[in-house]
Amino acid sequence: MPENAWSLIFDPKYAKKLKSCGISMLDSATDVIPAALHYLGKPAYSTNPADYTEATKLMRAIRPNIKIFSSGINDLAGGGLCMALGYSGDMNIAAKRAKEGKTGQTIEALVPSTGGLLFYDNMAIPADAEHPNNAHIFINYILRPEVAASISNKMNYATMTAAALPLVDKEITANKSIFLTDDAKKKMVAQGVTTNDMRRIMTRSFTQFKTGL
């Protein structure tokens, strides 16, 4: 097992060994390319086109080892894969399904030692919304402790509603890939803003990687 979990996918030395049992990758340029840049020690949301050239070169080297492009939930749970680059919630859902379905698969969501990409789900009300009061009612409903906790318990993601924490399953609050340690939080990379030009470069890089060109 490499010290940095990213190496399991981005280092051909490890990826080749996992090819036979299956590796999946998210079908998302805005997730995969920043992850590759971060692995290379570049800014995950770089504005330097040369960085994307390096990321493309890195990913071309591992392309033969990628079996499918998907979230990996069902394939992991069913034993069709042994490694997946995916969202922590999806990986933990796969682990839960494997356990409940008694598929014989032991799945663990790994937090890379160098950190990963951090994201938040947000709720917002458009300035010109026709029924802003209804939107406030819905948001207030989602923020109810019992509702926020049920979402965490179902989706395997952390809740930012402090009052909900006592209602979240202990198995989830103890899971360090869901509720990150303070040390892990410091290493996470928040989602950055990309210009249209950089987004086009990112998409082109991912397309070249996915098609093997």
Model-based region annotation:
Residues M1-G80:
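Extracytoplasmic ligand-binding site segments that recognize negatively charged/polar headgroups
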Residues D11-A15, K19, L37-G41, P64, ...:
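Sec-exported extracytoplasmic/periplasmic mature domains
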Residues A29-V32, G89-N92, T114-L117, E130, ...:
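Solvent-exposed loop/turn segments at secondary-structure junctions
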Residues G72-I73, L81, A135, A148:
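Short, hydrophobic alpha-helical packing/hinge segments within bilobed ligand-binding/sensory domains
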Residues M83-G104:
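A ligand-binding cleft/hinge motif common to bilobed small-molecule-binding domains
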Residues P126-K187:
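Mature extracytoplasmic/periplasmic domains
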